[in-house]
């Protein structure tokens, strides 16, 4: 695997820039919405009060209910076993808040803020150690999926900070910490298992059987937790969680001239489709190199995302975070032109939708 460069430049400037940028984003969002941290939560009457036909809010509210109420939150979850499967973020928020309902929404923001900065730091350090400009790590901090997830108290910042740091640790032969982080990440978001799968595919091609077994075992904590939830949670899924589909099949049934859906198709869907053949060719040409596998698996996830994700570019951007991380980890062996294209793929939706992200206001229930 790629070796570190001892004469690397400091990775701290882009990390500091990320912290300052997200601090400004947070302050502006709070100032626009009455200084209430519940702006990040996006509570909707349908799930907070059980009002049929009420506003649905957004996914961060389910983290909030779980962190605040524990098992008592199950009636307020659209898909109880699925939402409770992403237990790491609400559990961390509940612990940080000390059980205080007043402090809980602030704790959620603080954890995601720290996660964004930590994920950026891990990627910037990886790049700097390999003589790549660490400022490229801002493509992660500024990618639409991370910015939007941060603004809605979703689980992606925690999940992808863990999986980025875990993948880097594994590639740097720090197997113990890498294994632990890769095992924790699916407890924040299940799709992060694709990173362990990509690493395992490369290890399998190299016949590193011990690594294959270890990487497969990273899925066990999340699998055991999900099995427990499936057996223990009686509440049915309400409204449903979309199933994965054939590539691009989620986009076409809902295709129209809505700006959010057009942006999902042209800014994320078609670029992902263009990336897939090259990534697959990389796995064929160099099957023992993890980068091709990581990119191919995460790009494929974007393409097979369900209809709900294609409904708006910001929803699909959350699915695409894994592809951005995988591509950034491959920057040391990518051309300057490809690096620029990846950065554009990551941040273009953010540049277009940053204003609406800040301006949109939910119904902020206090229950």
Task: Go through each PLM region and give its residues.
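Signature aromatic-anchored transmembrane alpha helix within multi-pass, membrane-resident enzymes
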Residues: 215-223, 336-364
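Membrane-lumen/periplasm interface segments of specific transmembrane helices
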Residues: 21-36, 192-302
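Multi-pass, polyprenyl lipid-linked donor-dependent membrane glycosyltransferases
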Residues: 111-115, 135-165, 170, 185-194, ...
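Membrane-interface alpha helices of multi-pass inner-membrane proteins
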Residues: 163-169, 176-203, 217-220
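Hydrophobic/aromatic-rich transmembrane helices and adjacent perimembrane loops
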Residues: 311-338
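Transmembrane-helix signature of polytopic, membrane-embedded enzymes
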Residues: 103-107, 120-143, 161
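Short hydrophobic/aromatic helix or loop-helix immediately within or flanking a transmembrane segment
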Residues: 57-101, 322
């Amino acid at each position: 695997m790629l070796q570190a460069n001892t004469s690397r430049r400091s990775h701290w400037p882009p990390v500091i820039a990320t912290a300052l940028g997200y601090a400004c984003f947070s302050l502006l969002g709070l100032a626009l919405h009455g200084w209430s941290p519940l702006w990040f939560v996006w509570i909707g009457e349908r799930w907070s009060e059980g009002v049929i036909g009420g506003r649905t809010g957004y996914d961060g509210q389910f983290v909030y209910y779980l962190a605040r109420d524990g098992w008592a939150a199950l009636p307020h979850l659209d898909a109880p076993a699925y939402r409770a499967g992403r237990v790491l973020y609400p559990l961390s928020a509940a612990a940080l808040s000390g059980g205080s309902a007043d402090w809980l929404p602030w704790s959620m923001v603080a954890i995601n803020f720290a996660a964004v900065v930590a994920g950026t730091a891990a990627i910037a350090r990886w790049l700097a150690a390999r003589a790549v400009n660490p400022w490229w790590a801002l493509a992660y901090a500024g990618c639409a999926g991370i910015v939007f997830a941060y603004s809605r108290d979703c689980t992606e910042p925690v999940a992808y900070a863990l999986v980025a740091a875990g993948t880097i640790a594994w590639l740097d032969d720090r197997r113990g910490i890498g294994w632990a982080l890769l095992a924790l990440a699916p407890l924040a978001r299940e799709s992060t298992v694709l990173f362990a799968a990509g690493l395992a595919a490369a290890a399998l091609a190299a016949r590193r059987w011990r690594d294959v077994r270890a990487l497969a075992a990273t899925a066990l904590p999340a699998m055991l937790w999900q099995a427990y939830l499936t057996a223990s949670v009686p509440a049915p899924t309400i409204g449903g969680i979309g199933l994965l589909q054939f590539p691009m099949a989620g986009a076409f049934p809902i295709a129209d001239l809505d700006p959010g859906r057009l942006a999902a198709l042209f800014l994320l869907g078609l670029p992902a489709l263009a990336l897939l053949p090259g990534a697959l060719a990389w796995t064929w040409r160099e099957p023992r190199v993890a980068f091709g596998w990581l990119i191919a698996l995460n790009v494929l996830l974007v393409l097979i995302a369900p209809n709900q994700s294609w409904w708006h570019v910001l929803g699909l951007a959350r699915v695409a975070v894994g592809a951005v991380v995988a591509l950034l980890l491959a920057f040391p062996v990518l051309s300057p032109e490809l690096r620029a294209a990846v950065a554009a793929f990551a941040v273009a939706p953010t540049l277009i939708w940053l204003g609406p992200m800040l301006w949109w206001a939910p119904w902020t229930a206090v229950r």
